[in-house]
Amino acid sequence: MGQLFSSPKSDENNDLPSSFTGYFKKFNTGRKIISQEILNLIELRMRKGNIQLTNSAISDALKEIDSSVLNVAVTGETGSGKSSFINTLRGIGNEEEGAAKTGVVEVTMERHPYKHPNIPNVVFWDLPGIGSTNFPPNTYLEKMKFYEYDFFIIISATRFKKNDIDIAKAISMMKKEFYFVRTKVDSDITNEADGKPQTFDKEKVLQDIRLNCVNTFRENGIAEPPIFLLSNKNVCHYDFPVLMDKLISDLPIYKRHNFMVSLPNITDSVIEKKRQFLKQRIWLEGFAADLVNIIPSLTFLLDSDLETLKKSMKFYRTVFGVDETSLQRLARDWEIEVDQVEAMIKSPAVFKPTDEETIQERLSRYIQEFCLANGYLLPKNSFLKEIFYLKYYFLDMVTEDAKTLLKEICLRN
């Protein structure tokens, strides 16, 4: 686990307000979960010594992050793979309970919401293809209540169809953000490789597909949107990770957190970005009234602290896909016992006492390990309860667990 904080080296770093805002400077603009304006407000209130207003500002920021709702409209013609795309983003299989219905026949005649199973404030709306409704483009968008969505994703497979162009034009005219996703590129690559084994060039095939999309938009007088090539069967390849990055960076700051932690753990990069988002959240929580004190913290954890820690660990394990349900799914897919999957990672055993070590002793050891690895968290005249350190420790542990399982998944596939 890498060093999270550096030791204070100047008077500027050696005060609480500067420590608070300075921490967020390590995250680039597209990765922050709180705006600079709010950070400046919190720092100002800290400098004035108004603890109540400071805590109020931090609490309000956390509430806005937690309560923000993201509505994503996904539209495309029958067979384009839009329902599979929605299921992929929700981290569930096409045949699992609650999955968006897939098929070669249009199964969506009205818009249908699909909440993310772990982050219910993230909602994907499966819209019927415009061709199946017989509505003109503008009427289609009105019927689908276009104004309710944060952005649109247009899904298209194989070659462009008139309906793809019509819906893109209508969305553009209404000044709504949209992204174009060309699916099933794995099939295109396979077909080219089989048909032209001597001259096959994978990168050229992808380049030609992308260029065809660009030219089609231009020929129809549409400013080309962000274009992404992907396969719902191989989401860790092609443009899927790039698409996720683009969507997050384009979102309003306060809506980024929920979307980021909802994403499937398809690459080490996605897992690491989740960790960076959650680090910021823990930092905000660390300055809330129940974690920052003007007197030294207790040398032991209260029962209420343990419950808070268990809740945090459960949340981290869920968003990183190492919770009990996810482990059971992996065990079923790999045809092994759940205990064997649990043995590959560390987080399931954190709150299980052993003959050698009680839970309290284990948590105390974690705190010591964390402090040795990270040095100063805040100026020496500030005191934080152990729960703050442990949340960071748990986050690092679960992140590494997720990477371990992802590596195992790749080896077995």
Swiss-Prot record:
Topological category with respect to the lipid bilayer: Peripheral membrane protein
Documented effect of changing K161E: Blocks T.gondii ROP5 binding
Intracellular or extracellular location(s): Cytoplasm; Nucleus membrane; Endoplasmic reticulum membrane; Golgi apparatus, Golgi stack membrane
Induction text: Up-regulated by IFNG, IFNA1 and lipopolysaccharide (LPS) within 20 hours. Transiently up-regulated during the early stages of infection by Listeria monocytogenes. After 6 days expression is back to basal levels.
Lipid anchor positions (N-myristoyl glycine): G2
Effect of N212R: Blocks T.gondii ROP5 binding
Sequence positions that bind GDP: G79, G81, K82, S83, S84, T102, G103, K184, D186, S187, N232
Segments forming domain IRG-type G: 68-250
Location (main, coarse): cytoplasm
Record's keyword annotation contains tRNA processing: no
Protein family according to the UniProt entry: Belongs to the TRAFAC class dynamin-like GTPase superfamily. IRG family.
Role according to the record: GTPase with low activity. Has higher affinity for GDP than for GTP. Plays a role in resistance to intracellular pathogens. During infection with avirulent Toxoplasma gondii strains, recruited to the parasitophorous vacuole membrane. Required for disruption of the parasitophorous vacuole formed following T.gondii infection and subsequent killing of the parasite. Mediates resistance to Chlamydia trachomatis infection by targeting bacterial inclusions to autophagosomes for subsequent lysosomal destruction.
Subunit structure: Monomer, as apoenzyme and in the GDP-bound form. Homooligomer, upon GTP binding. Interacts with HOOK3.
Name this protein carries in UniProt: Interferon-inducible GTPase 1
Species annotation: Mus musculus (Mouse)
